[in-house]
């Protein structure tokens, strides 16, 4: 990969943390100068790293002060983008960091009106793991809106009552 001719987003998508750091060095830039850069679709470097399953880069960006709750033109935040990859190694740890940093669990994306927590829960329930379950319970502890419906008329409450684990259902009861 030619680092000189590639932008940071391309390096994140097709490269690795080493190439990302090399690009910074070549351009003589400090990470703080570019950490919150966004592309024409409003997607941040952090979001690109989550989409591309480059969780080492995501952690580096978070350690370097990347902001959370950057909203793309599709009205998605970092958790929406991470949800599709939540069952990949390292994803839950990054998701926990985002939750601890105050990610907006209730933000609804434009196409289906799914909240970030809905998107996350839906993906976690496709491949049930203890760490995924614990993540949803942690999110429920932040008291997201469980009754708000997406464009299909389904709420987080409905999703958990129908398909959730016992731990999720218990956390839901505490909220009621």
Predicted regions and their residues:
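N-terminal alpha-helical scaffold/docking segments in eukaryotic complex subunits
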Residues: 8-9, 13-17, 23, 27
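Ankyrin repeat A-helix N-terminal signature
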Residues: 10-16, 48-54, 81-91, 119-131, ...
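Ankyrin repeat domain, specifically the short helix-to-loop turn at the C-terminus of the second helix
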Residues: 24-34, 59-67, 96-105, 134-146, ...
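N-terminal accessory/assembly segment that mediates macromolecular interactions
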Residues: 40, 47-55, 60
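Conserved binding-pocket/active-site segment within a compact domain
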Residues: 112-142
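Leucine-rich solenoid repeat scaffolds
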Residues: 145-176
């Amino acid at each position: 990969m030619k680092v000189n001719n590639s932008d940071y987003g391309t390096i994140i998508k097709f490269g690795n943390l080493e190439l990302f750091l090399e690009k910074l060095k070549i351009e003589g830039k400090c990470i703080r100068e570019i950490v919150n850069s966004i592309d024409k679709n409003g997607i941040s470097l952090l979001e690109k790293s989550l989409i591309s399953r480059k969780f080492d880069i995501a952690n580096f960006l978070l350690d370097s002060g990347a902001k959370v709750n950057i909203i793309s033109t599709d009205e998605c935040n970092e958790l929406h983008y991470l949800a599709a990859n939540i069952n990949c190694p390292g994803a839950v740890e990054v998701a926990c960091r985002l939750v601890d940093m105050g990610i907006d669990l209730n933000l609804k994306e434009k196409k289906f009106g799914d909240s970030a927590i809905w998107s996350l829960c839906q993906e976690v329930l496709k491949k049930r793991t203890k760490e995924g379950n614990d993540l949803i319970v942690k999110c429920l502890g932040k008291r997201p809106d469980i009754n708000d419906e997406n464009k299909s008329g389904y709420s987080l409450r409905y999703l958990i009552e129908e398909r959730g684990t016992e731990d999720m259902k218990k956390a839901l009861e505490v909220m009621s």
